[in-house]
Amino acid sequence: MRKFGMVLLALFLALPVRAAEQGERRKVELPEMMKQHMLSNMRDHLATINQIQALLGQGKLDQAGDVAEERLGMSSLAAHNAAHMAPYMPPEMQTTGTEMHHAASRFAMTAKEGDLPRALESLSHVTTQCVACHAGYRLN
């Protein structure tokens, strides 16, 4: 009986997530080539966050900061060619993306201070923007 209760609880907790997945995200229309470019950028962002987490786990906070600034921070914008996609993005989506890049630059500075708990908290501000964007928008 206890197992049954746990299964019911898990299903109950999963319902809001499923409801959010089903249609509350705003569709963003992009030409196919730009859509693929944006998806590629987002996959690179995810791989970068993975690399940063590994470096933090190894105690290499300076390196984690360098990677963050180079690949996610404000310094990375030219490499991502994001400016040509901005006109296709809703203003709120642009703001969320820009805030992610600012948060990554702030993380880079925090990581270089060498305080792992503060660096991890700062990194969460980067991923908060990722979560917000993915919860609110869907490329079409």
What kind of feature is each model-predicted range?
Residues 10-18:
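Hydrophobic h-region of N-terminal signal peptides that target proteins for export
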Residues 1-8:
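Bacterial N-terminal signal peptides that target proteins for export
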Residues 9-10, 52:
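Enrichment for repetitive, rod-forming helical segments
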